[in-house]
Amino acid sequence: MDVTALATDYDETLAEEGLVSATTFASLQKLKESHRKLILVSGRQLPDLKQVFPKLGIFDRVVAENGAVLHDPATEEQRLLAPAPPPAFVESLRKRGVDPLLVGRSVIGTLVPNEMIVLDEIRRQGLELEIIFNKGAVMVLPSGINKATGLMAALDELGLPVDGVVAIGDAENDHDFLRRAGFGAAVANALPSLKKTADRVTLAPAGDGVAEIIDDILRGDIAIADASKNDVAIGKIARG
């Protein structure tokens, strides 16, 4: 199957220390010129992404807040894919001194080791929320919301099958994302556990690793099997 789209994480995948290099951006432009789609999938809030990467318009869709927000840069339309954080829950975290405490449209963000307080409040209030780690960051989201669900929402709007997508990431919150795509790649600086999930690990780290994958897509060196890894075999017909 042909590669129809590249979906990439932002921090320490596309970007290093929050910045995308000119070389990496040029690679994105080359892929765009090949009439393939570009999707950014990040745990960051959308206003934050716009600030650190003003050229967000190169992407056909942006999935922010770890799958909770879907954005179309061409129209500036946004779609919330998950409910807002419970106000009482947010207030309880503030009262218990959780700092930093970043509240998005759906995601709540903080840092390790605050996850113990967060987990205690989730249990105490009986909330259906999940804690997702991203290296030293801690994200709290409604159950079932992740980068994979956000990717699927983006592909639905673009009218593309997931089997033709190459996904690339580096951290804990990229596992489902890489598994769901037709082909999953981990950059060289990715966590060891994600490298085990990936179909391939790049030789170069971060943005250079993304450029490496793009070069291989353009050369036709990445082949996605016609039988999706997401399909489940439920039986076999014996002949003879």
Walk through the language-model features, giving the residues of each.
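Asp-based phosphoryl-transfer active-site loop
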Residues: 2-18, 178
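Short, well-ordered beta-strand core segments
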Residues: 6, 31, 62, 184-186, ...
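Conserved phosphate-coupling serine/threonine residues in phosphotransfer and NTP-handling enzymes
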Residues: 42-44
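HAD-like small-molecule phosphatases
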Residues: 50-156, 230-240
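Basic, amphipathic juxtamembrane/active-site segments
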Residues: 18-34, 186-188
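Mg2+-dependent phosphoryl-transfer enzymes with acidic/Ser/Thr/Gly-rich catalytic loops
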Residues: 1-2, 21, 148-240
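Short active-site oxyanion
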Residues: 35-39, 60, 77, 106-107, ...
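Anion (oxyanion) recognition and catalysis
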Residues: 32-33, 94, 123, 195
